Amino acid sequence: MKDLKSIKKLKILLTDVDCVLTDGGMYYTSDGDVMKKFHTRDGMGANLLRKSGIPTIIVTKEKTKIVRRWAKKMNIEHVYDGIQNKESIIPIIMKKYNVKTSEIGYIGD
């Protein structure tokens, strides 16, 4: 029951990309360009959260057009990419969205 109370406080979900929104595989074109495989259901989850008033924000170490393109297609408003220390972005998000740490969920490493 305690966990359900925590979920009700959720106002924002932060998520990593690799091994969370992708299968973690490394794919390359014949020209050596990197590709990622996203699952459609992950986008559906982000949409359900958005419709409930809970934005999903991507925070990732990588800086690729692929992630931004997928996020745009899935109506994910914000992508913080190239973030080497993911914890460093939390105060910025807290200020921007006027939330406490107890109201932020995170999926990733």
Protein language model regions, located:
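Chalcogenol-based redox active-site neighborhoods
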Residues: 20, 32, 73-74, 99, ...
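Conserved Lys-Pro-Asp/Glu-containing loop-to-beta segment of HAD-superfamily phosphomonoesterases
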Residues: 90-109
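Short coil/turn segments at beta-strand junctions that form active-site/ligand-binding loops
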Residues: 9-11, 54, 102-103
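Substrate-recognition element of Asp-dependent hydrolases with the DxDx(T/V) motif
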Residues: 46-70, 80
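Short hydrophobic/aromatic-enriched beta-strand-loop microsegments
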Residues: 76-84, 103-106
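Non-catalytic pre-domain segments flanking phosphatase-related domains
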Residues: 1-17
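A positional/architectural concept
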Residues: 21-51, 61
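Feature captures the catalytic cores and cofactor-binding loops of soluble hydro-lyases/lyases
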Residues: 65, 83-92
